[in-house]
Amino acid sequence: MDLCNRNDIQALLQRHGFHFSKAMGQNFLIEGWVPRDIAAASGADEHTGVLEIGPGIGPLTRELARRAGKVVSVELDRRLYPVLEETMADFPNFTLIRGDVMQQDLAALVGEHFGGLRPILCANLPYNITTPLLTRVVESRCFDSVTVLIQKEVAQRICAAPGTADYGAFSLLMQYYTAPELVFEVPNTCFLPAPKVTSAVIHCPARREPPVQVCSEAMLWRTVRAGF
């Protein structure tokens, strides 16, 4: 089964009685090069443990599982659980966590599942949780890198240079903890259903040391929020 083939996707979803939820920001990839290139950009290999958020029906999940030592995917939509059980049945290094990633203890999750592996995060993120989720992820300092497909406008904000129109508090936060780069853009025609916006993939290696030393990060972020 080709998880990026429109006909195969529709047959799979019909078999499971699945309908897209706009509230959950569900847009499934229908171009095979996109998950392949995202997985490649993540740097996943046999020494890597990958946390994926919102696997959908599993096209990126499969690409990651072919490369990584272990893939743990967190999915909120219970309607997709039997779908993923079918599409990921041939990958013993895959684990599905049923629930809301915003309620997960990321440090505990990494400790439980990725012992001896280099932890990274790679995902096609639902647009509606991008900012709060990435904030939690980078502040947790649990991951060696973060590679995500997100709305292009948000990607540009994350990668913006100081003093530009796109630069803001979220830019500063992401650049304090990581060194983000925009890797490639993904047109809306690569999704089912097609969103109204262009998307982009960013790769964010974690910084070993922050670019500036501060006495109190809590005070830093209070000042940043006041300044922006």
Functional labels for PLM-detected ranges:
Residues 1-226:
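Catalytic cores of RNA-modifying enzymes
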